[in-house]
Structure formats: C-alpha cells, structure tokens
C-alpha cells in the first residue's frame, strides 16, 4: 500500500493506474475508521480496478465551537485497517497542502445547492460549504471514476450528488448503506466519545427510526404523526436538534408522503452529536 501527502504525486498515481481503461474508486474519509468506512472500501474494490482512500480532517467544515481539535486521529490504526482491507493507495495531505496559505485565507469555495440549507444547514451554517469545497478538491487531487459515500450522512450525500450534477463533474457517486452495530446504533467515529451510559441511551435513535418505519409500513403516511412517534422515543437524549420526515430529494417538509421520504434525526447525547436516518420508500 502506497501513501501520498502530495497532490501532484497522488494525481500522478491515479493517472498511471487509469491507463488502459482501468477504473479507480475513491473513498474519502476523515480517518478514525470503523466497519462503516471499510464497507465503502469493499464496495470500491468490488466495483473498480483500483481503490484509493483519503484521510483528511478538513478544518473548513468545523465551526469554531465544534470538535476539530478533539477529533480522533488514530492514523497508525487507520493505515493498518486499510492495508488489511487491500487498499492500494492512501492520500493523507496536510492542511497546507489542501489549502495553500491556510484555510482562513482560502478565498475560493464551492457554495452548494439549496439542499444544503435545511437541517444541518440551520444548525451548522458553514458546514456544507466546507464539505463541498474539500470534496471538490479531493476529486481534483485523486481523479477517480467513482466515489463512495455512506447514506448515514444523507444530507452530505445529497449535497455532493447535486454538486456533481450541477458542475458536470466526470465522476459517479455511489451511495452505500448505513452500517450498524449489532444493537442498532449507526457506526460513527464519534461513538468513541460516548460513556457506557451514553452509549446505552443513544440506542433510542435507531429505535425511534424503527418505530417510524414500522408505522409507515402499516400505512401511516402523515409526516407530523411520524415525527411525533420519533420525538416520543428520543427522550433519553440530552437534546434534539431535529427529528423530521421530509421529501427524499429536496429534504424539505411535506404534508403527506406521496413519494419517497426520509426520517432524519440529529441529537446530542452528553456533548456528542449523533445523526441517523431511515428512508421511507413508497411502494
């Protein structure tokens, strides 16, 4: 497995590997890897001839009051996991490599479509500008045929899909299913922040989504009633940023589920912010 910190070297590797029509799959991460990330790697290896993973904790997607400095960076463990998974190349740039002159002086950015405005966009106003910008940069640094993203960060997935569509980027976005712990908690790098008590309380998130999905499958297509069901099950959380049922494509509120929708949750358990979702597919 090769590791690169230089954009030029990473780009050259991708160009060399793509000769003869070979395909490259990119798995962008911020490190602190778990089985959810590895599921993306496995999908990339299955679908493409070559697989490259990036590890970069992007400073521009963290607000001043968020956990950039505390974000876990177990780089040796991450590299061992990727090596065992059969990744061929890992791109690990510094912030200076990605943002010459520093992130604070970086004047050019990607402003995403309206799908970024609700939900996370309300609670983390600059977050998706940072996400869209760094993903665009990663697409340039590691030119690939497909990029693999998890559905757990569903709004992020929508933002990136819209960016690729609207800017005619020559890359296919491949959504991959949420990977869960045996007890139902969605895998997240932030789960390691939870105490044993908080970990148990966090199980209410997936349980609330299970209840919403069950009610939907039994014929309840009223978003407000489904949101009430979610709220009733989220009381073990310390706070709830949102627990909503919205249109799957626009992420905007709806009065009735007549086409595919999604239930999305963002909560805090202790000081740890956790998100999850469940798609509600109209038969």
From Swiss-Prot:
Pathway: Cofactor biosynthesis; (R)-pantothenate biosynthesis; (R)-pantothenate from (R)-pantoate and beta-alanine: step 1/1. It catalyses: (R)-pantoate + beta-alanine + ATP = (R)-pantothenate + AMP + diphosphate + H(+). ATP binds at residues 30-37, 150-153, 179, 187-190. Its EC number is 6.3.2.1. GO terms for cellular component: cytosol. SUPFAM superfamilies: Nucleotidylyl transferase. InterPro entries: Pantoate_ligase (IPR003721), Pantoate_ligase_C (IPR042176), Rossmann-like_a/b/a_fold (IPR014729). The keyword RNA-binding does not apply. GO terms for biological process: pantothenate biosynthetic process. It holds the Pfam family Pantoate_ligase. It is found in: Cytoplasm. (R)-pantoate binds at residues 61, 156. Beta-alanine binds at residue 61. Signal peptide: none annotated. Belongs to the pantothenate synthetase family. HAMAP family: PanC (MF_00158). The reaction proceeds by a bi uni uni bi ping pong mechanism. Homodimer. This is Pantothenate synthetase. It comes from Rhodopirellula baltica (strain DSM 10527 / NCIMB 13988 / SH1). The gene is panC.
């Amino acid at each position: 497995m090769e590791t690169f910190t230089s954009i030029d070297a990473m780009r050259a590797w991708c160009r060399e590997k793509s000769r003869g029509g070979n395909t490259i799959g990119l798995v962008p991460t911020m490190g602190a890897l778990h089985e959810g990330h590895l599921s993306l790697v496995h999908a990339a290896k299955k679908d493409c001839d070559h697989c490259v993973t990036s590890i970069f904790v992007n400073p521009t997607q963290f607000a001043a009051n968020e956990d950039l400095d505390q974000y876990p960076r177990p780089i040796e463990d991450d590299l061992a996991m990727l090596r065992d998974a059969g990744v061929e190349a890992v791109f690990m740039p510094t912030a200076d490599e990605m943002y010459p002159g520093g992130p604070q002086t970086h004047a050019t950015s990607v402003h995403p479509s309206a799908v970024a405005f609700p939900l996370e966009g309300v609670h983390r106003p600059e977050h998706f500008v940072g996400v869209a910008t760094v993903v665009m940069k990663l697409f340039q640094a590691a030119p690939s045929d497909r990029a693999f993203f998890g559905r757990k960060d569903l709004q992020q997935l929508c933002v990136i899909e819209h960016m690729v569509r609207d800017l005619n980027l020559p890359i296919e976005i491949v959504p991959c299913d949420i990977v869960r712990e045996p007890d139902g908690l969605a895998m997240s790098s932030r789960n390691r922040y939870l105490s044993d008590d908080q970990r148990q309380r966090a199980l209410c998130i997936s349980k609330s989504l299970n209840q919403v999905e069950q009610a939907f499958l039994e014929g309840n297509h009223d978003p407000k009633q489904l949101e009430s069901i979610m709220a009733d099950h989220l009381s073990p959380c310390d706070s709830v940023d949102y627990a909503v049922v919205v249109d799957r494509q626009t992420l905007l509120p709806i009065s009735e589920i007549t086409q595919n929708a999604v239930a999305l949750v963002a909560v805090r358990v202790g000081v740890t912010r956790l998100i999850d979702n469940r798609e509600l597919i109209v038969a």
